[in-house]
């Protein structure tokens, strides 16, 4: 029984190993939509968000691992959702926060399973 559990954990680990390509493929729709920019620099990937009103970049994040890239894109996506769901500039309600967190958690799982985002 112990061997089976260890094998399953090993197998889950192998499946869930992320690569930069997996993350970029998973979030291609978010990147193409302009939620964030992802650039490959000589130091690695960078995720940048654009503030249209201020006309400047903000939240520039260096991502040295695929997991860091996934989290930076998810953070930008959460910010996008917050702006989309909360149109009257109030602080998010607990329900709105839960909705954003659930969508983000679902996308994290999708990315870990090498899936692809199909809806913003």
Residue ranges: model-predicted function:
Residues 6-33, 117:
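Negatively charged, low-complexity tracts enriched in Asp/Glu with abundant Ser/Thr
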Residues 34-57:
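Short aromatic-glycine-(Arg/Gly/Cys) micro-motifs in beta-strand/loop hairpins
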Residues 14, 59-61:
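Short N-terminal micro-motifs specific to bacterial/archaeal maturation
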Residues 61-120:
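Mixed-charge, Lys/Arg-enriched low-complexity segments
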Residues 11, 52-53, 63-68:
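A short, sequence-level motif marking secondary-structure junctions
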Residues 30, 44, 76-79:
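Small side chains
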Residues 14, 39, 51-53, 90, ...:
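Intrinsically disordered, low-complexity regions of eukaryotic proteins
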């Amino acid at each position: 029984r112990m061997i089976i559990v260890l094998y399953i954990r090993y197998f889950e680990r192998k499946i869930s190993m992320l690569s930069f390509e997996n993350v970029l493929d998973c979030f291609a729709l978010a990147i193409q939509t302009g939620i964030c920019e992802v650039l490959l620099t000589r130091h690695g990937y960078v995720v940048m968000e654009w503030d249209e009103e201020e006309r400047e970049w903000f939240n520039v994040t260096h991502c040295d691992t695929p997991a860091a890239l996934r989290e930076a894109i998810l953070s930008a996506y959460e910010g996008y959702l917050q702006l989309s769901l909360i149109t009257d500039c109030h602080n998010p309600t607990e329900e709105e926060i839960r909705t954003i967190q659930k969508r983000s958690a679902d996308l994290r799982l999708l990315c870990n399973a090498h899936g692809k985002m199909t809806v913003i």
